[in-house]
């Protein structure tokens, strides 16, 4: 298939009338731009924790939290770099990551020896930055089930039948040997169950503020077995506050995720022709993700997310694409407008208008601004385009989730907050136009890193309108 496309120019003067916007179009080129679609080299694996230690310490202090206990796999990963494999296997969250106000620079990982064997990140120095409490299985399961005293639960005899009989025919692979060494080193902190490890952590904590943050209600059951008089607050919200500002190690992974995700989206957009289906296009995006060791999350095409919708792509109808995939947990989020053949004049005016707005918002994306400031500016700029199609803008922090930001209040349903932009936030400025009867849909979305002096684009921001 011969593929060609046009790029909408974005240098549009302020206050230009709609007819002027529509007149701005780029020169035709053949095939996807190599600089944006060449395969990217994988980044080096960060050697230390992903956790933003200084911010974590500040958040714990500001919220007067003595102990943060997390069991959600995403939060465990953020605090420890460890992937709880039992979660991936559908066996539940059988790990805890614990961060104390006394040692916010040194998380505790309470997990099964089997889980450490399967998923422990032993190929980096991160093992040296974590304290481990490992559990295996009670030596007497029946007797253990009848224990009520927490000291008996903590000190219950443990079976040591974990590793198979060891032979000396060949050396173990280095990463396996490191895991085994860590297991042996942590032997004094072995417990019969996950609960025993957490009870020990609770008894060893000095509760200055009498406050524990948890990200899962089931943790309350273990806390209730102690005689601690403590307040319980929303730990998931607390971790999301920490995650607003990325650490240097997170930024390494996120730079790659943003670029590789955008590359895969562009490849998919340029792969289609008249008669192709949404499934064809989505399959190309997933394939591109695989080439870059990215894990596809979803590709929204023309407001449609379900993968089994087989609809054909028609010439002249613009399609919004919203492409999300992740690398080592960190999400890329990229949106464009695609059309087979020339779009209608109205839709071309829309895509030019989105470019006009984005190019003038970008210089204002800086620390100290709030989401509401960006909304107000976007509304003003929309008025300057003379468009009557309607307009939406959704700035959101991106990280270990597509929308990685704390809710307005503890627990309950998530509610969007008016967040103040901060240095080292990774932000999406999301500007979709959904189906409203004008001949198509449109989208413009890039990821930016907020620095000291403004925002840095993490993916190239060309090809606002992709014509194939």
Predicted regions and their residues:
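Active-site neighborhoods and metal-handling regions in enzymes and metal-associated proteins
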Residues: 2-468
